[in-house]
């Protein structure tokens, strides 16, 4: 049953224009039902965002795939994720690169995600409980940064933790949000609007 739902999701993502076979394989391999509350497991393979507690959500599979594709990852990419959340996006990334650095401001989510990722034998991930607005300076510069919550404005710290040619994929806005890909060229940053999106807000500070 799970296998067929995974195949249906794969077919849907292809219809939506996701064509990167490595990303599609990563999504097929991961049991999305493990990343959502048990009561919502029957909805895990639908293209919906689902609540995971603490006012946070797991993004819809299309958005996970699209944002991952926009990062243009190589296996050796130095990668930062802001907002570990359920750990699902983190797990997809971990299937594609040698190592993922992920920051989460809500301690309980960070702990649960860390435990689940290890249960799934994904050991190439470093998680940190901290304010995502600050990035992870000691691990920078990054080839790619992905932000899984919407910021009102682009966090400067994240821009300047990008390598030359590095890419930041981030939703921006409050009520109306746009998904942006920002590429660094020296001290200039080229911004592309990808599409309209809906994310929970990126909040500053960290929570125990």
UniProtKB/Swiss-Prot annotation:
<dbReference type="InterPro" id="IPR000682">
    <property type="entry name" value="PCMT"/>
</dbReference>
<dbReference type="GO" id="GO:0030091">
    <property type="term" value="P:protein repair"/>
</dbReference>
<dbReference type="GO" id="GO:0036211">
    <property type="term" value="P:protein modification process"/>
</dbReference>
<keyword id="KW-0949">S-adenosyl-L-methionine</keyword>
<dbReference type="GO" id="GO:0032259">
    <property type="term" value="P:methylation"/>
</dbReference>
<dbReference type="Pfam" id="PF01135">
    <property type="entry name" value="PCMT"/>
</dbReference>
<dbReference type="GO" id="GO:0004719">
    <property type="term" value="F:protein-L-isoaspartate (D-aspartate) O-methyltransferase activity"/>
</dbReference>
<protein>
    <recommendedName>
        <fullName>Protein-L-isoaspartate O-methyltransferase</fullName>
        <ecNumber>2.1.1.77</ecNumber>
    </recommendedName>
</protein>
<dbReference type="InterPro" id="IPR029063">
    <property type="entry name" value="SAM-dependent_MTases_sf"/>
</dbReference>
<comment type="similarity">
    <text>Belongs to the methyltransferase superfamily. L-isoaspartyl/D-aspartyl protein methyltransferase family.</text>
</comment>
<keyword id="KW-0808">Transferase</keyword>
<comment type="function">
    <text>Catalyzes the methyl esterification of L-isoaspartyl residues in peptides and proteins that result from spontaneous decomposition of normal L-aspartyl and L-asparaginyl residues. It plays a role in the repair and/or degradation of damaged proteins.</text>
</comment>
<keyword id="KW-0489">Methyltransferase</keyword>
<keyword id="KW-0963">Cytoplasm</keyword>
<feature type="active site">
    <location>
        <position position="59"/>
    </location>
</feature>
<dbReference type="GO" id="GO:0005737">
    <property type="term" value="C:cytoplasm"/>
</dbReference>
């Amino acid at each position: 049953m799970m296998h067929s739902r995974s195949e249906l999701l794969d077919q849907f993502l292809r219809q939506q224009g996701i064509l990167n076979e490595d990303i599609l394989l990563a999504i097929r391999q991961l049991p999305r039902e493990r990343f959502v509350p048990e009561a919502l497991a029957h909805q895990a393979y639908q293209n919906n965002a689902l609540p995971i507690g603490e006012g946070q959500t797991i993004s819809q599979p299309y958005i996970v795939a699209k944002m991952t594709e926009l990062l243009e990852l190589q296996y050796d990419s130095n990668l930062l994720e802001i907002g570990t959340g359920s750990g699902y996006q983190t797990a997809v990334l971990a299937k594609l690169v040698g190592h993922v650095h992920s920051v989460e401001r809500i301690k309980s989510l960070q702990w649960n995600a860390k435990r689940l990722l290890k249960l799934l034998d994904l050991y190439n991930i470093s998680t940190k409980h901290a304010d995502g607005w600050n990035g992870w300076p000691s691990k920078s510069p990054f080839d790619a940064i992905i932000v899984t919550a919407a910021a009102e404005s682009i966090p400067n710290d994240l821009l300047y933790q990008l390598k030359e040619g590095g890419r930041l994929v981030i939703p921006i806005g409050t009520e109306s949000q746009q998904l942006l890909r920002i590429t660094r060229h020296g001290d200039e940053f080229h911004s592309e609007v990808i599409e309209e999106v809906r994310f929970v807000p990126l909040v500053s500070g960290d929570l125990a």
